[in-house]
Structure formats: C-alpha cells, structure tokens
C-alpha cells in the first residue's frame, strides 16, 4: 500500500487526537455486538450476554486498547505494514485461527468510531485515507494466511 504525503498527513493529524483506550474499547465492543460470531475468540472475557455487558466489559476495553495501540504502530510505519504486523499475523493465523475477514470488519468499526467522534472533521478525504490504512492493516494481518 502506498500512501501519499497528504494521506499520511491526514492520518497522523487525526491520530494525534484519538483517545486510544476509549476508541479501541468501543471498536472491539462494537465488533462483538454487531458481528456476534466474533465472540467465539473471546471465551475468556466473561460476561458478554448483552450489548451493554459487552460495551462495559473491562477485558473487551483492555483488548481494544491493545488493538488500537497496534494501530499506532501502523500510523508510524505506513510504508511497511506487512513487516510491522508480521508477528501479529502469525499469532492470529497459527495460534488463534482468527478468520482474516474479521480484520476487515474491525477496521470498518474503527472508521465508524472515528467518524462518530470527530464529526465534521472526518471529511470524505479523511475517511478515504483511514479506509486505506485499515484495509492495509487488514491485508498485513492476513498475510500469513496466504
């Protein structure tokens, strides 16, 4: 994936304003609510019996923070997403057996959360750059599957 200087600027500019803990927890929580079959990867997370239980679950929030922190690595390494996510790709493929489609779904959740948090600042141009980034991360995470 090649990012233009403008795309990089738009992504890093917004990233500097992102609350990683809040956004990450909300993105993973939404993923688990909207796509309930993804819950099977999180059996150890305890109560996920309802949307409010999922959104308030401390383990969901903690994992969300971890996920979004790794997105920070993507922002810093846009020119080497495959290398940046090689170890995580291996973990999710070989050990956890996560369906790579879930990475795309999570990326879309992140874009939705950013749009809701940043409103008018999340212009179509900003969205286009972020969609490109989350798609690049999803592809990098799925790399070990091919």
From Swiss-Prot:
Binding site for heme b: 63, 92
Key words of the record: Heme, Iron, Metal-binding, Oxygen transport, Transport
Domain Globin per the UniProt entry, residue ranges: 2-146
Extra information: Hemoglobin theta chain is an embryonic beta-type chain.
CDD domains to which the protein is assigned, alphabetical: Hb-beta-like
Keyword Transport included in the entry's annotation: yes
Cellular component terms per the entry's GO annotation: haptoglobin-hemoglobin complex; hemoglobin complex
Protein name: Hemoglobin subunit theta
Native species: Sus scrofa
Family from the record: Belongs to the globin family.
GO process annotations (BP): cellular oxidant detoxification; hydrogen peroxide catabolic process
Gene Ontology molecular functions: heme binding; hemoglobin alpha binding; metal ion binding; oxygen binding; oxygen carrier activity
A Pfam family of this chain: Globin
Keyword Protein transport annotated: no
